[in-house]
């Protein structure tokens, strides 16, 4: 199979699911603000080397033009935490910084298409009777006879995972392409949505759509008044594994994303952050008492009992 049993149970454990009004991202924003840490926005770590005064030297760069920063600043730390998959971080590791480079694991390449249109979903496309109302959320599944092990064709003839009607909106007057009420849609798919698909799904005259839908970003039409595509490596394929990444890649170098190949959720990654924070404190206490120890099986990993399926 392409997913292990425990992750399957996690996917089915939706009872009591909640969200924050305005977006779950606010949880992590407030976590960061409550920490009183120095937060460097629009700044990325470009490389990690062995330090001279401390264990690690981090080189960073600004992601926006900034004349005031003509050089790449370097800061040294005794402990560092990499809280992103290394394979997507664009961070270069110096020689002998870690004992073993984490394995690259395959991620789902998810195409998210957000757009506005006065049109509604076509009942005909879904085999409904003329005039039948289409639900606000459409989820697809594969036919029983389809080979679901083929990662290149995991949605079958439907061509998408889901379509959601997010809200209804009325844009400010003065924009000819956005006159009247608009429906805001979101499509999840394994490949870019094509003009032919959009035409069939929403009963839009094909000749009114450009061959490349990305042209709608700059040139919206009366049928598609706003268009925003985004590609995410959204979550990993949770294949059954017998080994997993270490939490501590080297002495004082912690890696929360080792959890990704086991279970990939916000909650479990937050729990991993809690575990890493505890390990950092434990290591400092041991160092103060005259010991030096990297992560071993004897170190207590907290929170395991809190993982409920």
Stretch-by-stretch model annotation:
Residues 153-309:
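Conserved flavin/dinucleotide-binding core of flavoenzymes
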